[in-house]
Amino acid sequence: MGDIEFKSSPEFSLGMEIELQLLNPDTLQLVDGISPLLAQTPENSWIQPEFNQAMVEIASQVCSNIPELEANIVAILRDLKTRCQALGMTICTAGTYPCCDRFASITPIPRYLSQQNTSGYLADLMMTCALQLHVGMPSGDVAIDIMGRLKPYLPILLALSASSPFWWGHDTSFASFRQRFLSSMRTYGICPTFKNWQDFTNFFATAQNAGMFEIIRDIHWDLRPQPDFGTLEVRVMDAQPTIKESMMLAAFIHSLIVDMYHHSQGKQTEFLLTPLPWLIERENYFRASRWGLDANYIEDEQGNSRPIRNIVKDILNVLAETADTLGNSSYLFQLEKRLDQGASYIRQRRVFESTGSVKAVVASLVSELEAELAIKSRQEAVAYGWL
């Protein structure tokens, strides 16, 4: 394979993908329902199959700002819920399905079947869901530059998004067990660092020749360029049970990337987190997945650490002006409140501690999304805490 063309897109445009679980509304068990769902959905629609037949992925339109993205995702999820209800299913999402008791049924698509063949037993256990955000880039070189700058922030995003404390009915003690599971897969996890777009294309040519990847989509790193879309795709995050949490994270990433771009153009001077050696990167990943917002992040090569909660507050202060310019301030305000109110992994554990039931945890995830999708007025949104 020769040079890969990076198809530029409008700077900092946005696209979101969310993976969700298909459930029986009475038993709250997983349902292998993707085939009938696809059968009643128009081609080239917002709905897409996932690796597991009991899961579905939705994809937004290309949007210019977070409010537009939010409106699009709300409309898509309402439509999805209506379609699922007609088929006797309901939906929810989190980084893992808390009370799984069976192997995954792989969606019979050649790419997924090939992945199953390569991954072996790991494919049978693949019951994870992610939130993915695409941000438009003007060129491949800019995408690779921002990729390197954003890399130290990935453990922060992991801690903020952690929503997978349960695995096969057990409390794993991790905030994000999804990240621990995926770290065992050959094409997932921490992305390498590249000098520029040509450096990336040289790497991909070597990897392709070695039989590691066939296409770019075979790369499942937590951060990857998408040349066909002209985007940088942030993939580190657990799926969020609520739309408002997804939008908080999207606004945080959007503001962060725009600020980084300004920094690269000499328009900003403050840059909080810097690249770290691989072993420290791995340790920060582990800490974020294990302790979530209570983790201490290693900031430098001397081993100095600070609480992630404090680092997030510092980042939000730095991003305040950029967020205001982008119209993201209200979302970041909600994100800061959430530092004290509790991320999803904390809420799930509270439900389990009060009920002793993992099924009750699933019911709470279903209820959280249903409550949002039922909101029809600004007054209801304020009461719910949406605004």
Swiss-Prot record:
Keywords: ATP-binding, Ligase, Nucleotide-binding. GO terms for biological process: modified amino acid biosynthetic process. InterPro entries: GCL_type2/YbdK_subfam (IPR050141), GCS2 (IPR006336), Gln_synth/guanido_kin_cat_dom (IPR014746), YbdK (IPR011793). Its EC number is 6.3.2.2. The keyword Amino-acid biosynthesis does not apply. It comes from the Bacteria. Signal peptide: none annotated. The keyword Ligase applies. It catalyses: L-cysteine + L-glutamate + ATP = gamma-L-glutamyl-L-cysteine + ADP + phosphate + H(+). GO terms for molecular function: ATP binding; glutamate-cysteine ligase activity. It holds the Pfam family GCS2. SUPFAM superfamilies: Glutamine synthetase/guanido kinase (SSF55931). Belongs to the glutamate--cysteine ligase type 2 family. YbdK subfamily. ATP-dependent carboxylate-amine ligase which exhibits weak glutamate--cysteine ligase activity. HAMAP family: Glu_cys_ligase_2. This is Putative glutamate--cysteine ligase 2. It comes from Trichormus variabilis (strain ATCC 29413 / PCC 7937). The lineage of its organism: Bacteria, Bacillati, Cyanobacteriota, Cyanophyceae, Nostocales.
